[in-house]
Amino acid sequence: GTYYLVFSQGERQFKVPYEIAARAEGSVARRSFTTADMIYLLMPDRFANSDASNDSTPHTRERADRSAFFGRHGGDLQGMIDHLDYIAGLGATAVWPTPLLLDDEPEGSYHGYACGDYYRIDPRFGSNELYREFVGKAHDHGLKVIMDIVTNHCGTGHWWMKDLPFRDWIHQFPEYTGTNVCFS
């Protein structure tokens, strides 16, 4: 049904409708991946390029540059589709591509972990429609698909990064500050 999110500030209120759709029939019976699966993890940009026409697009900032170590190299969904026989032939039962969602950072985001739009496949990989085709063909090969979506961080280009509710909503340092801890 439709529910309303109610936002208020002092005496002012506004409501936003939010629909919760019914589950698709049989979705509760859907099987997930388990310890019995052999999962093939792949980084789409580095895996296989079957459509050079989408390596660089007019609506994304970083251009393909195979000579750049941290640059985009052009792998795409069509390359993944074209190699499903190979993946299944290895004995894999599931395929896990790193994030395929739009990641339009100016550089170094070929890995997909700086999402800018959680609803759209990055056009350098293909389209939402091609993603659905990939999933269907993977299922035809007996492969489950794990969609990698990281919701606890996003790219600097995501709209909510440009409209933070408070300046200290996220950690902001005057210069680059390494925050990862490495153990050897």
Regions found by a protein language model. Give the residues of each.
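Extended acidic/polar, glycine-enriched regions
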Residues: 1-32
